[in-house]
């Protein structure tokens, strides 16, 4: 049956989620297939996606903790069952979900005797805890216990040099990897010149995002990585003249929008990516840092939201407006935009 589906060489490449489950609050699983692929393509896609899923997706972690009147991280605190080192390890395991950029502050301030869990962390509005039952420490006596925390969004495994912090602040080796594991396998089918491959992709995440969301973000990161190669450099133009110039994808915003306008249901704004807009590299990078990936994301923001983005200036706002006004129906702009 599968052989009949992929035998035709003219079939469109399609992907599908064939299994999705939640094993626990901190363990999500998803299984996907992509087909039909020509011989060798499944391995190429599988390797690229696996590396992007494990290394290119950002996560939010606790990166620093500040204790009061603690001489070193191996100290014990009277009235607390765990040592400072054990508390730091427990904080390292806390799974957070957010879209923040930069460093944010959080804190814990409780009175014993009681168990301290992730639910006791006082977080900024843009951050939430995936599993509030994660343990931190056990207060065995009626003492006041306070910790100042630092939260940061990053990617990969981040380490800091151990220093003698006089203020009681200790770095935490953060693992900013929402994807816990990725496996892929390849199934070949067909005969002779019509032989094709099916890619099976398995993704496990820590609950801060779903496997489907992780696959989407990894795919977008790969697309962004290859964007510079979609435009050949003009003959006789030096690299220095082109290094700061943004190069849009092959399908321009105008062409995509023209096709979308033919849809009677209206324009699917979540199908237009900001990569397809005629934006400067600086404006484009500002929007990407703020997790604005599609036109729907952009139109959902107010002017105040945009102006709060790091390095976003008034000229960026004007440039975005001019671009949208040029290509979008004016009634859509009036309904969607508040700036």
From Swiss-Prot:
Record's catalysed reaction(s): RNA(n) + a ribonucleoside 5'-triphosphate = RNA(n+1) + diphosphate
A single BP term in Gene Ontology: DNA-templated transcription
Keyword Zinc-finger included in the entry's annotation: no
Residue numbers spanned by region Alpha C-terminal domain (alpha-CTD): 264-339
GO cellular component, one term: DNA-directed RNA polymerase complex
Presence of keyword Mitochondrion: no
InterPro entries reported for this sequence: DNA-dir_RNA_pol_insert, DNA-dir_RNA_pol_RpoA/D/Rpb3, DNA-dir_RpoA, RBP11-like, RNAP_asu_C, RNApol_insert_sf
Listed GO MF terms: DNA binding; DNA-directed RNA polymerase activity; protein dimerization activity
Keyword set, alphabetical order: Chloroplast, DNA-directed RNA polymerase, Nucleotidyltransferase, Plastid, Transcription, Transferase
E.C. number: 2.7.7.6
Gene3D superfamilies cross-referenced by the UniProt entry: 5' to 3' exonuclease, C-terminal subdomain, DNA-directed RNA polymerase, insert domain, RNA polymerase, RBP11-like subunit
Domain of life of the source: Eukaryota
Alpha N-terminal domain (alpha-NTD) as annotated region, ranges: 1-233
Localization annotation: Plastid, Chloroplast
Family: Belongs to the RNA polymerase alpha chain family.
Domain writeup: The N-terminal domain is essential for RNAP assembly and basal transcription, whereas the C-terminal domain is involved in interaction with transcriptional regulators and with upstream promoter elements.
Complexes and interactors: In plastids the minimal PEP RNA polymerase catalytic core is composed of four subunits: alpha, beta, beta', and beta''. When a (nuclear-encoded) sigma factor is associated with the core the holoenzyme is formed, which can initiate transcription.
Role played: DNA-dependent RNA polymerase catalyzes the transcription of DNA into RNA using the four ribonucleoside triphosphates as substrates.
Protein name: DNA-directed RNA polymerase subunit alpha
């Amino acid at each position: 049956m599968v052989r009949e589906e992929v035998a035709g060489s003219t079939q469109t490449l399609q992907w599908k989620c064939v299994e999705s489950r939640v094993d626990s609050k901190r363990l999500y699983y998803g299984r996907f297939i992509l087909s039909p692929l020509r011989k060798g393509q499944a391995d190429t896609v599988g390797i690229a996606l696996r590396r992007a899923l494990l290394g290119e997706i950002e996560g939010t972690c606790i990166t620093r903790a500040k204790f009061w009147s603690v001489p070193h991280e191996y100290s014990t605190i009277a009235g607390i069952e765990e040592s400072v080192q054990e508390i730091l390890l427990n904080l390292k395991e806390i799974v957070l979900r957010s879209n923040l950029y930069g460093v944010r502050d959080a804190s814990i301030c409780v009175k014993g005797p009681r168990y301290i869990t992730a639910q006791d962390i006082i977080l900024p509005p843009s951050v939430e805890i995936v599993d509030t039952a994660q343990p931190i420490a056990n207060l065995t006596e009626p003492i006041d216990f306070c910790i100042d925390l630092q939260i940061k969004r990053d990617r990969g495994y981040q380490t800091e040099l151990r220093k003698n912090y006089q203020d009681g602040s200790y770095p935490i080796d953060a693992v900013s990897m929402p994807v816990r594991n990725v496996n892929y396998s390849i199934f070949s089918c067909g005969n002779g010149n019509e032989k094709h491959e099916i890619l099976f992709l398995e993704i496990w995440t820590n609950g801060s995002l779903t496997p489907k969301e992780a696959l989407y973000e990894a795919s977008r990161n790969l697309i962004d990585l290859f964007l510079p190669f979609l435009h050949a450099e003009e003959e006789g133009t030096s690299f220095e003249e082109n290094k700061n110039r943004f190069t849009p994808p092959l399908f321009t915003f105008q062409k995509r929008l023209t096709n979308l306008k033919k849809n009677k249901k209206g324009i699917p704004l979540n199908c237009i990516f900001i990569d397809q807009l005629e934006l400067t590299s600086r404006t484009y990078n500002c929007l990407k840092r703020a997790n604005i990936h599609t036109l729907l994301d952009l139109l959902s923001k107010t002017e105040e939201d945009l102006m709060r983005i790091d390095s976003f200036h008034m000229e960026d706002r004007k440039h975005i407006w001019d671009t949208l006004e040029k290509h979008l129906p004016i009634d859509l702009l009036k309904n969607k935009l508040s700036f």
